[in-house]
A protein has these predicted regions:
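Short flexible linkers and secondary-structure junctions
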Residues: 1-111, 249-253, 283-293
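Amphipathic alpha-helical coiled-coil scaffold segments and their short linker/junction regions
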Residues: 5-8, 30, 60, 67, ...
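Sec/SRP-type N-terminal targeting helices
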Residues: 12-13, 29, 75-103, 129, ...
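Periplasmic alpha-helical coiled-coil/stalk elements that build and connect Gram-negative outer-membrane
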Residues: 81, 99-213, 324, 348-351, ...
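A short glycine-centered flexible hinge/capping loop motif at secondary-structure junctions
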Residues: 145-149, 353-357, 394-398
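Short terminal targeting/anchoring segments
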Residues: 153, 357-378
Length: 410
């Protein structure tokens, strides 16, 4: 899990996106402050040396040195720049929570892939054990055949059962390889470098899930918090679009020094300045401002409805996950009973086979029932673990309340 958080490429891309959003927020916030720039120049010119009568009067050379500084500031009377900056900040917050969404999805996918790897390994071990059991029964049937108490049909049926069990192993190994490859992608490693050795679903500690989970836990879901931030950004954009209907007021100042002699450039008599105030009121723009305002209003409404749907969906996700945990727990318990009864029936049929009192049909049926019960138990264990992972994801990363802020790029 820790490795996936640090090296997963999806998380890295999401982190880069919220770094971009932070930069965009700083760009938008710059409009709230004055802009200041400075400059300097040296200008050389020479006048013509020819008079109107065509006589030469000698040209004049002029050198001008200038050092200046200019400042401009837009008075944000109507809050256009303030709302635009707030919208950018909320977008940056939304991108942080989007990174958390990607991280949560990655962690749950890693858990699911790991559990699938363990389940595949368990099923392969079960299949190999079943092959050994079936081969042991085949040897006993062959002994009966040699003793004259068995038939060719008995041997052929058991051989078919052994072959069928052996044929079940390659698909399981293929599934195991695919799950390991999926795990390798999540931790950004070559598949051949990922090894899960000796693990089993039986060793996984199952966390206790209380039935009375508080609804406040849903507030830690990053997708809900992302939608909240996106809605806040859209609301600020509406304010910025509304402000475009009103005049914009710009203040511009320019000051500096200008002299034909560099040594006298910063003398008091060489100073100059100017201050200009201007106001611009939109009169006719073909409906651009109105269209932009209506667009931002519609976008705000869209995100409001999306937010409502996300909240409703979150309750459904939790309910589905809790129901899945309950049903898979019941299934696992019942499947354990099935396995115990099947194992007992198989042991009795094997004893009767060796005593010569069991018919081959009974032996075949008890074997098949046991083999299916063992494989179904592994699948039931996996289903319960996947249900717990789905609840973890539905609650935004656990079932314990926590105070948590989104990850900051800085």
């Amino acid at each position: 899990m820790k490795e996936a958080q640090t090296v997963n490429l999806d998380i890295a891309a999401a982190t880069a996106r919220f770094v971009q959003a932070d930069a965009q927020a700083r760009i938008a916030g710059a409009a709230l402050l004055p802009s200041l720039s400075g400059g300097g120049s040296e200008a050389y010119s020479r006048t013509s040396g020819s008079s109107a009568s065509g006589l030469s009067i000698g040209g004049r050379e002029v050198v001008n040195y200038t050092a200046s500084m200019s400042a401009s500031y837009q008075l944000d009377f109507w809050g256009q720049n303030r709302d635009a900056a707030q919208a950018a900040e909320e977008t940056a917050v939304a991108n942080r929570f989007d990174r958390d969404v990607v991280a949560l999805t990655t962690l749950t996918t890693v858990a699911n892939a790991y559990f699938n790897v363990l389940a595949s390994q368990d099923r392969i071990r079960t299949a190999q054990s079943n092959i050994a059991s079936a081969q042991r029964i085949l040897n006993a049937i062959k002994e009966r055949f040699k003793a004259g108490t068995g038939t060719d049909l008995d041997v052929a049926q058991q051989e078919a059962l052994v072959a069928n069990q052996r044929a079940s192993v390659p698909p399981l190994r293929q599934t195991l390889d695919q799950n390991i490859n999926a795990l390798a992608i999540l931790v950004s490693r070559p598949p051949e470098s990922v090894r899960v050795i000796g693990g089993t679903l039986n060793q996984i500690a199952i966390p206790r899930v209380t039935p009375g989970l508080p609804s406040e836990l849903l507030t830690q879901r990053p997708d809900i918090r992302r939608q909240e931030a996106q809605l806040a950004s859209a609301t600020a954009n509406v304010g910025s679009a509304r402000a475009q209907f009103f005049p914009s007021i710009q203040l511009t100042g320019l000051g500096g020094y200008q002299s034909s002699a560099l040594s006298a450039l910063f003398q008091p008599h060489a100073a100059f300045f100017s201050l200009v105030g201007s106001a611009t009121q939109p009169i006719f723009d073909g409906g651009r401002i109105l269209g932009n305002f209506e667009f931002t209003k519609a976008r705000q409404d869209e995100l409001l409805q999306t937010y409502r749907k996300t909240v409703i969906q979150s309750f459904a996700d939790v309910d589905n996950a809790l129901m899945s945990i309950r049903q898979t727990t019941i299934k696992l318990r019942l499947q354990g009973d099935v396995l115990a009864a099947s194992r007992r029936a198989f042991q009795l049929s094997e004893q009767q086979l060796r005593a010569g009192t069991a018919d081959i049909v009974t032996v075949l049926n008890t074997q098949l029932t046991l083999f299916q019960a063992e494989d179904s138990l592994s699948q039931a264990q996996l289903a319960r673990l996947l249900a717990i992972v789905s609840l973890y994801q539905a609650l935004g990363g656990g079932w314990e309340p926590r105070m948590e802020k989104p990850v900051d790029a800085l």
